[in-house]
Swiss-Prot record:
Basic residues bias: start-end ranges: 1-32
Pfam entry (one): Ribosomal_S20p
SUPFAM superfamilies the record matches: Ribosomal protein S20 (SSF46992)
Any Gene Ontology biological process: translation
Name of this protein: Small ribosomal subunit protein bS20
Length: 106
């Protein structure tokens, strides 16, 4: 006799659907963070201090929100913010752009 096909566990199917939604949401957040970070670095390389600092603050805000919602670990978020700020500051100093009022200390 042919064996019956095993039934699906409904809770497992629901958890899988939830994980797929969560994955897309987390991926979008991380992508936005990376995009803004790259844009801030690019503007800093061009010596556009005002715009670079503005974009950097937006990226910093998104990083904090991602850490709050457990998309990023809090230490990973702190590391990303630190590296971004250091990179932007170094590039702006190299370009000779003023850092006053930007929130970047030496």
């Amino acid at each position: 006799m042919a064996q019956k096909k095993p039934k699906r566990n409904l809770s497992a199917l629901k958890r899988h659907r939830q994980s797929l939604k969560r994955r897309l949401r987390n991926k979008a957040k991380k992508s936005a963070i990376k995009t803004l970070s790259k844009k801030a670095v690019q503007l800093a390389q061009e010596g556009k201090a005002e715009e670079a600092l503005k974009i950097m603050r937006k990226a910093e805000s998104l990083i904090d929100k991602a850490a709050k919602g457990s998309t990023l670990h809090k230490n990973a978020a702190a590391r990303r913010k630190s590296r971004l700020m250091r990179k932007v500051r170094q590039l702006l100093e190299a370009a000779g752009a003023p850092l006053i009022g930007g929130g970047l200390s030496a």
